[in-house]
């Protein structure tokens, strides 16, 4: 299939498809060009079949369209000389189609999928960094962007469309990538965007409240994540045994690797396991001692907080399960770097320690505050807000958490979007026992500045919610704004 051809592409599904040379594959009629294959799916917002005339006018070579309500599965029609092949359940088949189109890229590198509410980005980055230190050419795909380490290009969604994912992977293979760590979102699993990928390993970090505006309730959210193990080629399963959902899944996955820092492992029950035996937190990170099926060791980590110890142990267990030697992993561990905007520490002489983190769920905020507290000798400040046009139920929960775990809560705007900023802040304050104690400043830069300038040298200021993002969405406008740049400027350091 080196010269992409419609007949070869559809061979497993439509034996009598016509022969047509194909250039690119796209779901977007606006970018469809001469010689392309236009795939007309029925999505949540639009029916791609309405754009078939536009794609034909732009010179596409062939069209594959959803059959439901239009034609029978495998039916071939012709419109203005362009073959239109109808397939039923096209969304479910899209990953496999794109995989064939791009020559099955997940067969040509080691692909590790990471799913869970929190920790996906850090765990994927640690996997990519660590494998690269051991000689792989490593890449990441996810929230921060896609690409080879150090050459990551920002993206809109955690998991792109099924076609985007295969296309990106093929591009990485073309750049000689040998290892890729990919964040796998619950939306991506439900919408079959990674359905045909062959994962060498699949990591589960944890499950807590998020995306309930999409999934409806926690049971549906858990079911969405479980799809990675039940419906996909998941390879080695690496599961966080400290998470209640993780423990449930371990009971269903006898060959999985159980990972714990809270002694939730009985070596007699789990075939392969890794657990922390002692963790000492200090100014610049943590010293972690562990035992495992592969042997014991000690790691010096530059990452802050208990959950980052968990992320590091998950990455370590994954690489051990994939056959990387323990001695080599221990030798390179001290060279692992924190991830941009994930418990990222900014310091300057005589100034408070400032930590920028992406925490935007109740659980993540609690963990970030607990993590910052481990490294805090003075007062702990928390600057945060909640996004507009998103799950409103989490706002009072986050207010309550900030009040309980921080000494000073500063409530500000996050991405208000089309909601009234003050209404969002009021929802947050409603969760506090004594809202009068919280400082309220709608302007985010002003709120961050106020906290950093008022905090003392041995205080820690956690700026939560935006992490690596370099924009703020107000109304329908995307404004330039970065917590990292704001903090760096205040401390006189480089972001």
Swiss-Prot record:
Pfam family, one: Mur_ligase_M
Positions of ATP binding: 116-122
Post-translational modification N6-carboxylysine, affected residues: 225
Entry GO MF terms: ATP binding; magnesium ion binding; UDP-N-acetylmuramoylalanyl-D-glutamate-2,6-diaminopimelate ligase activity
Source organism superkingdom: Bacteria
Residues that coordinate or bind meso-2,6-diaminopimelate: 390, 414-417, 465, 469
Gene3D superfamilies from the UniProt entry: Mur ligase, C-terminal domain, Mur-like, catalytic domain, MurE/MurF, N-terminal domain
Binding site for UDP-N-acetyl-alpha-D-muramoyl-L-alanyl-D-glutamate: 27, 29, 44-46, 157-159, 185, 191, 193
Sequence motif Meso-diaminopimelate recognition motif, residues: 414-417
Family note: Belongs to the MurCDEF family. MurE subfamily.
Described function: Catalyzes the addition of meso-diaminopimelic acid to the nucleotide precursor UDP-N-acetylmuramoyl-L-alanyl-D-glutamate (UMAG) in the biosynthesis of bacterial cell-wall peptidoglycan.
Name the UniProt record assigns to this protein: UDP-N-acetylmuramoyl-L-alanyl-D-glutamate--2,6-diaminopimelate ligase
Organism: Escherichia coli O157:H7
Gene from which this protein is expressed: murE
